[in-house]
Amino acid sequence: MRGTTNGADDMSGELELSILGVAGKERPDGAVDININSSRGEINGILHTCEGQPGAVIYVGGALGGLDGPADGLYPKLARELSGPGGMTGLRLHYRQPGEFEECVLDVLGGVSFLRGVGAQRVVLVGHSFGAAVVIKAGELSDAVIGVAALSPQLYGTRTVERLAPRSLLLVHGTADRVLDAEASRDIHARAKEPKRLELYDGAGHSLRSCAEELFELAKSWLLETIASGANETENDNAV
């Protein structure tokens, strides 16, 4: 896949990442440690497979990377819960070069390409903090992406968020975030096109730990609804 970049927003100079191979090793919990060998280095992650389902989610962390996400391990909780019957495959992805915006966008696009290669037809992206801007940009660049959830997002990298439409956008922020003010989500929401949704949690900080249970339920329902709406659109397109 190819991304283009001249700064985080314009993405006008070309960058390219090709997948050369994939290796996997099953974990005791049934998930799979995934190593994606790319033309720009190795991308590692944990895959939670949902057999026979066409929907998939990629989860990415903040500027330091990581696999667990905010809110006391939101990502593994969601990935395990949603990999059951009628759910969706989840890929918890770690960046090759944490904090390097364009490279991290390419990592997410590489994850999308991998998921498409194993049968996913519709992909949703979830990111926290720095990673929220990463998934917004990656969503703009991939036709396979049907929705993006941005948790406690930064503004840098989101200037062209209007290009995300018609993909669904969920923005979540805590009103007591002292790392990235909730005004960032308000600003992104104001510039984004429909369909979009903004959820603010009163008193929650950057990690969203104090609203972990509410966030889990919100994210779960939104992911299921977004994947289902993507399926309905596909059926309508096929009927035309």
Can you say where each PLM-predicted feature lies in the sequence?
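Short beta-strand/loop motif that positions the catalytic acidic residue
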Residues: 164-165, 170-173, 177
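Short, surface-exposed "cap/lid" segments of acyl-processing enzymes
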Residues: 40-42, 50-90
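Catalytic histidine-centered segment of alpha/beta-hydrolase-like enzymes
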Residues: 204-216
